[in-house]
């Protein structure tokens, strides 16, 4: 299961999209109720696994940034590994303390500031950008970043394919890893 929000060791810690799941071990509850192995992770961490596995992003730092009219977030690949952070909150750009705009017209500028903060902190070689909603102006987003940051900080910008498709593909990768880990534990490898 891919969830928008912070997920740590199978527990949804904080999800604005699904607040009723906060602090619940969803995987454990579903396992107990249906007898199925359930894996749960952050949606961007899941999608980032696709880029990690099927691209040449094994060296250096790559940031995947997804943004829309009401949400934004990022996934981070560092030297071939997806960074989740100590509490699963790596990439949760909503935690960066910036002014939140009241009107939708400021959304691009707001997302630009958040992405600039990530670029300044992580200094990635590339940023892959997903548009979560129709009508988002990625050219404007990139233009704002280029106008405000020093040229040596600017990464290569790429447009992501389809965020939701990458989430589904990423779930298969997470399941594959989970099954292998479960087998190793059961067989004492």
Regions found by a protein language model. Name each.
Residues 31-124, 135:
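Glycine/GP-enriched mid-protein hinge/lid loop-to-helix segment characteristic of carbohydrate kinases
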Residues 24, 94-95, 185:
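Short amphipathic alpha-helical leader/targeting segments
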Residues 2-5, 67-68, 130-133:
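Structural motif
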Residues 33-36, 56, 98-189:
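ATP-binding/phosphotransfer module of carbohydrate and carboxylate kinases, centering on a glycine-rich
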Residues 13, 17, 67, 114, ...:
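A general structural-boundary detector
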